[in-house]
């Protein structure tokens, strides 16, 4: 259920981040992480699927939440999600990284077990960084641009030939997108059904409502972190 909802977050908020990035950069921004993921090699797999999730979950869930949960569970979870999203320093990823960070934070808060959020993190990174790029390589996308132009000029045979040559890859891609869509749909249904079942408990040193934001986000360390990551994110839009 959680993985289904997570994939829905990745898809929908990723679209928001992409549109906003392109709008702010006048169409010049590129998703550097996606470009890197397309370069499938063993080291990318090791860092993206194994080491990255382990480090990030240890840092943003274990360390951050363990040190702030005494001030309020919701406060700690939102802080974990925001820090996780900003840490990526990539507007393409910020929105879905934030929501995933919140979800992973809630899972860790309720279980106090890092292995659950880490496993989900690995699955999501494997899908986006290994499985999806591999599926895309099964289809000759470079040639597709050419045959599409030829088809627009009336050369339908070129498109038919390309489809015939890439039939296996297209079939794999179709199955993948159908399964992906089904997972997103299931995740949405489960989210609606279980949203109100979320539980939060009063912490021993719960911050009063009126001072939470100032205390958590207004300190020197957090302000510095936010300013630096936002600045680097903005610079990255134009590089």
Task: Please report, for each region that a protein language model flagged, where it lies by residue.
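His/Asp/Glu-rich metal-coordinating catalytic cores
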Residues: 17-52, 92
């Amino acid at each position: 259920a959680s993985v289904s909802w997570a994939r829905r977050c990745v898809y929908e908020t990723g679209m928001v981040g992409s549109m906003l990035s392109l709008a702010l950069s006048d169409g010049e921004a590129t998703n550097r992480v996606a470009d890197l993921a397309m370069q499938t090699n063993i080291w990318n797999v090791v860092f993206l699927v194994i080491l990255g999730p382990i480090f990030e979950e240890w840092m943003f869930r274990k360390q951050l939440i363990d040190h702030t949960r005494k001030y309020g569970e919701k406060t700690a979870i939102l802080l974990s999600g925001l820090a996780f999203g900003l840490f990526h320093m990539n507007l393409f990823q910020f929105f879905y990284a934030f929501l995933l960070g919140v979800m992973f934070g809630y899972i860790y808060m309720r279980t106090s077990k890092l292995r659950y959020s880490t496993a989900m993190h690995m699955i999501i990174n494997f899908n986006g960084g290994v499985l999806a790029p591999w599926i895309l390589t099964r289809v000759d996308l470079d040639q597709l641009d050419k045959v599409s132009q030829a088809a627009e000029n009336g050369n339908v045979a070129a498109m038919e030939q390309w489809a015939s040559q890439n039939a296996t890859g297209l079939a794999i891609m179709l199955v993948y997108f159908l399964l992906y869509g089904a997972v997103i749909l299931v995740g949405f249904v489960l989210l609606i059904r279980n949203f109100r079942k979320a539980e939060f408990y009063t912490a021993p040193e719960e911050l009063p409502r009126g001072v939470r934001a100032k205390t958590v986000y207004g300190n020197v360390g957090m302000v510095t972190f936010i300013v630096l990551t936002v600045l680097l994110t903005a610079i990255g839009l134009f590089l």
